[in-house]
Amino acid sequence: MGRVPIGIEGLDKALHGGIPEGNVILISGSAGTGKTLIGLSFIYYGASKFNEPGVFVSTDQTPEELREEAKNFGWDLEELEKKNLLRLHHIDVTQEKDMVYLTKINDLAKEINAKRIVIDSLTTLTEFLSPMEIVEARGGKLFETLGSIVPVPMSETMIAKSVIIKILKKLKQTDCTCLVTSELPESGEWLSRDTVSEFLVDGVITLRPFKYARSDVDLLVVKLRYGDHSKDLHKISITDKGVEVKPAEKGVVI
């Protein structure tokens, strides 16, 4: 299985060359740790360095906002869009019904023959759907009918798991190499807020604020199916050129 480089040198070294082709990787971290920027880097470098078309899907930022953010690092996303190497898509979770965004993502990927897809973020997508919408999205016509007579109870956890399973299944069907982001719980052993993503994806990278310095972020490749990876802690820094990843100093406590 070949490797797909993210394009961030230090992170690709930690991944021993990149992500195994066709894998879906979870980037999980608290707010402000760099999840979105790593995802955008994956898409931008894929298009600009490796000529691999990509689709970036955001629940929090519009295409215009993403283009403006990219300019801070000297990245011209519009030029890549004109060359059919990039598609940006915003999901308005307050307006979406029946998870139709999955069809849109698939259509955009086919339109440019995408090799890379990023969804930012799973957390938002799992927090704005009703139980009945999940049933409908899964094709549960019997439950849909029963639900009009007797409500079908579904806990928030069940809803989240249904959404995640559906999304990851669709991503796998695209044959693209994918990154998905999630909020990382502040405490506990879970690696995502939905508590199920980490078991369904092929790999997990966590981003945590360094406990002794607010400006520093710890990066750790927790798992990578179908390939070896560094087990060492790494540090993230944001420069005017984007994300930099370097090995942490020996002896640093996580």
Segments predicted by a language model, with ranges:
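Pre-Walker A adenine-sensing motif
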Residues: 6-18
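Loop/turn-to-beta-strand initiation segments
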Residues: 53, 85, 113-116, 174-181
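Phosphate-binding/switch loop-helix module in NTP-utilizing enzymes
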Residues: 91-172
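Short hydrophobic/aromatic beta-strand immediately N-terminal to the Walker A/P-loop
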Residues: 25-28
